[in-house]
Amino acid sequence: MGGISIWQLLIIAVIIVLLFGTKKLRGVGSDLGSAVKGFKKAISEDEPAKEAKKDADFVPQNLEKKEAETVEKQKQNDKEQA
């Protein structure tokens, strides 16, 4: 009906095993698995660096707000004293 049936996939798998052999297929599978594992590890190591950058962005803004509040308080105190 236009789609690939399970029997066709099974026949293709048998032909691939006969052509390449099980040792080469195991080697390719393990290489592919280690590549995926390395990719996932690299992605997970990259995410904390992005979070650290976000945290670093918030710290200076808070300091600027505190400094601005301190300056405003000093101005109010100066006005009250004068």
Swiss-Prot record:
This protein's record includes keyword Transcription regulation: no
Keyword terms, alphabetized: Cell inner membrane, Cell membrane, Membrane, Protein transport, Translocation, Transmembrane, Transmembrane helix, Transport
GO CC terms in record: TAT protein transport complex
GO biological process: protein transport by the Tat complex
Gene Ontology MF annotations: protein transmembrane transporter activity
Superkingdom: Bacteria
Keyword Transmembrane attached: yes
Membrane disposition: Single-pass membrane protein
Compartments where located: Cell inner membrane
Leader peptide range in chain numbering: none
InterPro entries, alphabetized: TatA/B/E, TatA/E
Residue spans crossing the bilayer: 1-21
Disordered: annotated segments: 48-82
Pfam families in the record: TatA_B_E (PF02416)
PANTHER family the UniProt entry points to: SEC-INDEPENDENT PROTEIN TRANSLOCASE PROTEIN TATA (PTHR42982:SF1)
Family note: Belongs to the TatA/E family.
Subunit structure: The Tat system comprises two distinct complexes: a TatABC complex, containing multiple copies of TatA, TatB and TatC subunits, and a separate TatA complex, containing only TatA subunits. Substrates initially bind to the TatABC complex, which probably triggers association of the separate TatA complex to form the active translocon.
Protein name in UniProt: Sec-independent protein translocase protein TatA
Species for this entry: Aliivibrio fischeri (strain ATCC 700601 / ES114)
Taxon lineage: Bacteria, Pseudomonadati, Pseudomonadota, Gammaproteobacteria, Vibrionales
